[in-house]
A protein has these predicted regions:
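Short beta-strand His + acidic residue motifs that chelate non-heme Fe in jelly-roll/DSBH
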Residues: 26, 45-46, 62, 68-74
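Short acidic-glycine-tyrosine-enriched beta hairpin
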Residues: 35, 49-65
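A short glycine-rich, His/Asp/Glu-containing loop-to-beta-strand
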Residues: 1-28, 32, 140
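Double-stranded beta-helix
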Residues: 69-140
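Surface-exposed, flexible loop/turn segments at secondary-structure boundaries
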Residues: 43, 51, 68, 88
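Short, conserved beta-strand element in jelly-roll/cupin
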Residues: 15-20, 29-46, 84-87
């Protein structure tokens, strides 16, 4: 399910571990719905230009077209489970990156409207996948 070939091509599942201040990605909207569950720690949601604090077990539902991004917050790492539909994942019409003052203040915003991830992520260093580390999840 987490490999190159999706067992369920209509569903995407990702686990993010974010240090305080680290964004999950860039402020964007998608043509498909997404859901996020904070498994541990604290996070900051920027949704439709507004900042909202999140804590463990908070669930966020973003209907299609909702502009959003999540960042790590608090004093330590947070763990966020992201689940989303993948019907429009590839090709034209997937969504886009929009300019937002709150997202830019946190280093999580594109500087121009675009649908091209190479443009939106140009100033961001490439992220490397890592294995689970002891202590990331509560009670582990």
């Amino acid at each position: 399910m987490f490999g190159d070939e999706a067992e369920f091509p209509q569903l995407g599942v990702n686990l993010f571990v974010l240090a305080p201040g680290d964004p999950m990605g860039m402020y964007h909207w998608e043509a498909d719905q997404e859901d996020f569950l904070v498994l541990a720690g604290e996070a900051l949601l920027i949704v439709e230009g507004e900042e909202r604090p999140l804590q463990q077990w908070d669930l966020v539902h973003c209907p299609a077209g909702t502009k959003h991004i999540i960042l790590g917050a608090g004093n330590g790492p947070c763990v966020v489970l992201a689940i989303g539909a993948r019907e429009h994942q590839n090709g034209a019409g997937w969504g886009g990156y929009t300019v937002d003052d709150a997202a830019l203040r946190h280093g999580a915003g594109a500087t121009e409207e675009t649908t091209d991830p190479l443009v939106a992520y140009a100033p961001v260093p490439r992220r490397e996948a890592t294995r689970y580390r002891e202590g990331w999840l509560p009670g582990a």
